[in-house]
């Protein structure tokens, strides 16, 4: 039986409010239902163009939208939806697996000494859910509790340990160090700086690099940090397809030529960070086709200007 939108919203509100008040029964490895507004960021910037791609894609491809909602909830993908299905109403569509079945696909949080939930993976996905039609601050998601830091006495100690665990990115979009007090306090793109190099890494994926089996957290940011001194973006018009393709090609050539054993300060080599042996011309050409990632992104981006 399908719940009405009002009933589901009431259920989600009660459910997540309960978690916000009492986390005593929650442990590392648990799957936790929350609203997006309950999640605190651990990075100051995102790649706007990656989010624009998703938003543009969802506007024209409802199956992709529901598929990624299911995936984020650890449910593999969507198995059924119809014209009446609504993103925030889980009973209005069906996923392939129960919640939490595919935990490797879920976004992760940690519990801080102040009993707040800090998002350590999924800033792009959840900002997309925040801004998409049918999304918003009260959009319900399930997250995986990666670590519990409540035994630490202070928030200063928490952030120090989070940094040691490489579960936070304390650099601004110009790669200048920041304090944790300078981080956004909530999701929503307007609270994040735009890092165009982070977007370039997203679109160059499968062309010159791919995520290794066990990627280091913030892998794309490390690569972006490595590229910035070598690749000024002023010569590229990132509002046009050709300009963006030129930038992706230039970034990919630098990635393929990179021989550093410390990409962006990660302590890892280019190969360990997913560097390809050669330029994938077929995947690059795909970016210029109709209904490509670039076409969806540029269409949405242009409409916002």
Could you describe each region identified by the protein language model?
Residues 22-100, 104-109, 113-116, 124, ...:
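Surface-exposed, charge/polar-rich loops and edge strands
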Residues 119:
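Active-site-adjacent beta-strand anchor residues
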Residues 1-19:
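Gram-negative bacterial Sec-dependent N-terminal signal peptides
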């Amino acid at each position: 039986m399908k719940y009405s939108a009002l009933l589901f919203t009431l259920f989600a509100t009660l459910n997540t409010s309960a978690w916000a008040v009492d986390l005593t029964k929650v442990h590392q490895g648990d799957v936790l239902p929350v609203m997006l507004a309950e999640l605190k960021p651990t990075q100051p910037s995102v790649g706007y163009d990656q989010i624009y791609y998703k938003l543009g894609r969802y506007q024209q491809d409802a199956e992709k939208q529901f598929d990624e909602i299911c995936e984020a909830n650890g449910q593999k993908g969507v198995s059924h939806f119809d014209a009446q299905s609504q993103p925030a109403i889980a009973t209005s569509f069906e996923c392939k697996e129960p919640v939490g079945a595919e935990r490797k696909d879920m976004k992760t949080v940690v519990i801080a000494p102040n009993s707040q939930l800090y998002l350590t993976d999924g800033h792009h996905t959840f900002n997309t859910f925040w801004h998409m039609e049918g999304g918003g601050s009260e959009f319900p998601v399930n997250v995986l509790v990666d670590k519990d830091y409540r035994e630490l006495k202070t928030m200063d100690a928490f952030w120090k340990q989070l940094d040691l665990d490489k579960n936070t990115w304390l650099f601004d979009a110009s790669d200048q160090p920041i304090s944790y007090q300078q981080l956004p306090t909530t999701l929503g793109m307007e609270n994040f700086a735009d890092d165009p190099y982070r977007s370039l890494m997203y679109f160059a994926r499968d062309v010159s690099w791919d995520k290794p089996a066990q990627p280091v957290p913030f892998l794309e940011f490390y690569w972006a940090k490595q590229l910035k001194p070598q690749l000024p973006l002023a010569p590229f018009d990132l509002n046009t397809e050709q300009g963006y393709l030129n930038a992706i090609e230039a970034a990919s050539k630098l990635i393929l030529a990179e021989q550093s054993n410390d990409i962006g300060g990660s302590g890892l080599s280019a190969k360990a960070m997913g560097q390809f042996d050669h330029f994938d011309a077929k995947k690059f050409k795909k970016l210029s086709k109709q209904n490509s990632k670039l076409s969806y992104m540029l269409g949405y981006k242009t409409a916002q200007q």
